[in-house]
Amino acid sequence: MKIIVAAEELPICASRMEPSEAIKNWISTPLKKIPHPDKASKIQIEFGDRSKESLHLFAKPHFMVPDMLDDDEMFFVGAPGFYSPEEFSDEDCRRIEESMKAYRCYPIFQKRVKYSKMIEEILGKNTYEFVQSNFDHANMFARYKEYNTRWHEKIMEIYEEGDVVWVMDHSLFLLPGMLGNSIPVGMSASVPFSSLLKCIPFWEQIFSSILCCRYIEFNESSSKESFDLLVSQKTGFCMGDPGYKDIREPLTCVGKKGIDKDVLLKMSSEVHEFEGLGKGKVILLPSDSQTHLLGVEAYLSRYGKEITVLFLRTRVLNGDSDKQAEVMRLREYLEINYKVLSREFTPASDPEFISMLKRCDLCHCPEVADVCSLFGIPVVRNNPYDFFDIADEINENLMQRGEGSKEGSSEVIGKMEWKKRFMTSLLSISGMEYDVDLEPKEPRIRSSLSMDQTGHKKVDAKKKPGIRKKNREKEEAVEIILNNKEDANAARIVNDFKKSKARTLVMDYDGTLTNIVARPPMAAPTQEIKDLLIRLGKICRVVISTGRSVEDCDKFFPKEIEVFAEHGACHRIDGKWKEGGTFPQKDLAWRIGQFFLARTPGSELERKKTGYAFHFRNVSPLIGVKQARALFELLMRVCKDYVKKGNHVIEVRSSKKSCAMEKIEEGFVLCAGDDVADEDMFDVCKGYTIKVGDQSTSAAYRVKDPENFRMLLGRLLE
């Protein structure tokens, strides 16, 4: 298995210039187009004509992108860093592609399209520019679709069964839908999410594609809440959209992007503070945002203090020269009317960037907010459009600067912590169990990139590195057709059963032997089911492995039937129960369940000896899904090893259903179930495994419903 990272740009760049010259040239060249008469005096534009005939590779600085180049599990798909189509010939592109493969990078020679900028602007609360002033939406969306198709095609060239895809950019919102539900896809949302999504032309195609993700990580709780609300509106029973009825909702969480904090902190001790920025407090701003500068203007008009504004350029302007001209005019206005010194800064290396940060007193630049937090620099958190709230926050932060800020902020996470959190959640929700390599890596490749691939062996993307699969390969389950008496699979199972001397049947109850019902207490077995179990018990060992409580099992199943209750925590044999262990957070987990029960009308809390089940099948979908998700996330913090999602249920338990398989004799074994919890049994069963229903599974076979499964059991008695 590979982790395929889909991003707008690769972490590796290709150029004919030296790295520092290439970075400054890439960022500065578009500034020539700014329609402002004084631009030469305001901006130090870096134009390098000292290009070389030979191409060479280099990695982006650590502050621009977390360094995962030495992580053998990660494969990267995207445009080369700082890509410019005018710079390379077709032969250059071929050579770059061949060279980058040695570093698990698969380049796409494609520039960003305008629709990506529209998504960024609208979700950033600027709806006018693209919705009102630009009406060429259909063509823009068509080009955006073509752009995503290029990434899809490149990923499918290296994709193998069992790989996962990690989408890291809003330029690729259509990619999850193109990959489909069969490929596990996770997304790190790079822009804020809100109901303004509906202002984006063709937004429903974007939203439907995003819903194909298994796991989505937002960088703030408000984005997650907005997304969850929109999902519930679209999929809810009462007011939902019929077009979304078959959608499987992704797991959503809040988490920050990881950075190379160890490397950056180490460099901090080796560089000196940047000089030449005047005496006032230094505020860091993005160079192309009039909105952020207006917040500073509000601060100056309200408080009138002397400051230095440092405009940081770490990205190209995407051709938006008119906006940059407006920023420059506003800068002139501030310099004339207030005590303001302004400077532009284009860092071409990590030491340059850190040297500049050491002189800053406040960060109002979202793209480097995490790095600033790492160095103890206060970050403006308010909405950038609430100018006077921004003004007050700037004043408060500058007044308190230096009182409690320290390097190495605990709010900032490292790249491996980020990978661990993201991949653990994605693989878990996808039903995949792997040993993910989480060891920190020394950045060796970064310092030895070469067009000649010196010292590096070309990586075969079809060979699976790094991640070791714990269980057997999951193949599509073969359906057993019970109304066809000539079904070869059913006949094989029956023949093997009759030929074997030692025979064991291990079965779930709800959804397997009987249909799921609206209320759990109503699911008592019929006399037909009881008789079937007793008759089977006379010719083989019958084991019921269920999540139900001990009390329910005593009511439901004849005493001669062996039962593992509460997901294996309690075992009944010969009518006597043996209880397993519990876990330390059991009482706290129960109180959390009671809290959500009181706030979720229609829910039920089923208490068991070693845990409980929170049922939300009868809750309005608008409320139930949101409350269940909140309960699950809270329980994951309290007792993550003992909480599981099921079919309209959140369960807290101290054991796994696979306990029922531990003392199975050799011979014929059949294991059947319908829920996610039953996958634990399938993974350790050495005999026949049968999934009841149409959900994804690692079982070898499946039957349509409980009625068909009972028909199969009936054939064993013939």
UniProtKB/Swiss-Prot annotation:
Keywords: Hydrolase. This is Probable trehalose-phosphatase. Its EC number is 3.1.3.12. InterPro entries: Glyco_trans_20 (IPR001830), HAD-like_sf (IPR036412), HAD_sf (IPR023214), Trehalose_PPase (IPR003337). Residues 459-470 have a biased composition (Basic residues). Residues 449-470 are annotated as: Disordered. GO terms for biological process: trehalose biosynthetic process. In the N-terminal section; belongs to the glycosyltransferase 20 family. In the C-terminal section; belongs to the trehalose phosphatase family. It is an enzyme of class 3 (hydrolase). Coiled coil: none annotated. The keyword Hydrolase applies. It catalyses: alpha,alpha-trehalose 6-phosphate + H2O = alpha,alpha-trehalose + phosphate. NCBIfam families: T6PP. SUPFAM superfamilies: HAD-like, UDP-Glycosyltransferase/glycogen phosphorylase. It comes from Encephalitozoon cuniculi (strain GB-M1) (Microsporidian parasite). GO terms for molecular function: alpha,alpha-trehalose-phosphate synthase (UDP-forming) activity; trehalose-phosphatase activity. The keyword Hydrolase applies.
